[in-house]
C-alpha cells in the first residue's frame, strides 16, 4: 500500500500486476483450493455477506426462480434457504468438500436437495432440463467462464430464466482503478477470484440474452436476469 500511495503523490500511476499464466486457474486447482477452505468458507465471506449486503442481493434475485432449479457452483449452499418454498432444487459444485457443507445446510433448513459433484463447464444434464439456472459469485473463478455460461444456457429451457449475481468492474473510476491495481493480490487472497471482470460482456459472449441488469454495492456486484437466445 505504501508504494501505491507514494506513486500517487508523485503523480505516477501504479500499473496492475496481472495474473501470471502459470497461476491461471484450472479445474483441478479450483477443486483443490475450495476443498481446502470449505470448512472456513462462510467465515471468510461473512463481511461481504452481512456487512456489504450480499445476502440481501441473493434473496432479491433468487426470489425470481421458478420450477425446476439448477444452482451451478453452489458452494456451501448459501442459496439454499433463499429459493421459493417448495422449489425442486438440484445443486452442483466441483468441490466435494464444499458439497458436504451444502448437505449440512440442506439438513439445517429441512430441505431435500439433489447434490452432485460436477464441473460447471461440463454439466451432465440433457439440453433444456431446468426452468431456472442460477449461479452466484462464480464466473469470477471459472477457468473458462464463457464456456460455463454456455453450459448454463444449454441446460436451461428455451423459455427459462438464468439468474446471476457476479463480481465485476465497478463503474466508479477510482474503485475500478483500485480493482485493477490489486487484481493479482485479490486473486491470490480470494481463491482465484477475478474481481475486475465484466459480467455482462461474458454473458453476451455466451449467447445469452440479458433481460435486466443492475449494479450494486459501489457498482462491484452485478445482478443479472437473462434467458437463452
Model segments located where?
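C-terminal alpha-helical "lid/dimerization" subdomain adjacent to the S-adenosyl-L-methionine
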Residues: 28, 45-48, 163-221
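Conserved class I S-adenosyl-L-methionine
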Residues: 20-65, 78-79, 101, 179-186
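A short SAM/SAH-binding and catalytic strip from SAM-dependent methyltransferases
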Residues: 132-144
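Class I SAM-dependent methyltransferase SAM/SAH-binding core
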Residues: 68-122
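A short glycine-rich, Lys/Arg-flanked "PGG" loop and its adjoining helix->strand segment in the class I
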Residues: 146-161
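C-terminal lobe and adjacent flexible extensions of AdoMet/dcAdoMet transferase-like proteins
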Residues: 223-229
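A short acidic, Gly/Pro-enriched loop at the edge of an enzyme's catalytic core
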Residues: 121-133
Amino acid at each position: 500500500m505504501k508504494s501505491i500511495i507514494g506513486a500517487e503523490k508523485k503523480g505516477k500511476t501504479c500499473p496492475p500486476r496481472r495474473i501470471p499464466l502459470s497461476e491461471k486457474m484450472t479445474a483441478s486447482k479450483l477443486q483443490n483450493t475450495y476443498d481446502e477452505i470449505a470448512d472456513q468458507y462462510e467465515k471468510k465471506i461473512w463481511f461481504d455477506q452481512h456487512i456489504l449486503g450480499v445476502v440481501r442481493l441473493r434473496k432479491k434475485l433468487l426470489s425470481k426462480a421458478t420450477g425446476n432449479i439448477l444452482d451451478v457452483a453452489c458452494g456451501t449452499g448459501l442459496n439454499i434457504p433463499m429459493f421459493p418454498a417448495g422449489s425442486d432444487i438440484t445443486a452442483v459444485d466441483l468441490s466435494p468438500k464444499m458439497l458436504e457443507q451444502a448437505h449440512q445446510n440442506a439438513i439445517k433448513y429441512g430441505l431435500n436437495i439433489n447434490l452432485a459433484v460436477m464441473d460447471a463447464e461440463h454439466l451432465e444434464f440433457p439440453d433444456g432440463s431446468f426452468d431456472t439456472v442460477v449461479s452466484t459469485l462464480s464466473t469470477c473463478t471459472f477457468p473458462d467462464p464463457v464456456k460455463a455460461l454456455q453450459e448454463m444456457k444449454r441446460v436451461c429451457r428455451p423459455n427459462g430464466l438464468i439468474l446471476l449475481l457476479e463480481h465485476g468492474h465497478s463503474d466508479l473510476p477510482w474503485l475500478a482503478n483500485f480493482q485493477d491495481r490489486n487484481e493479482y493480490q485479490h486473486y491470490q487472497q480470494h481463491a482465484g477470484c477475478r474481481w475486475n471482470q465484466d459480467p455482462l460482456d461474458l454473458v453476451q459472449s455466451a449467447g445469452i440474452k440479458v433481460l435486466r441488469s443492475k449494479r450494486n454495492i459501489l457498482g462491484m456486484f452485478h445482478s443479472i436476469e437473462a434467458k437463452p437466445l
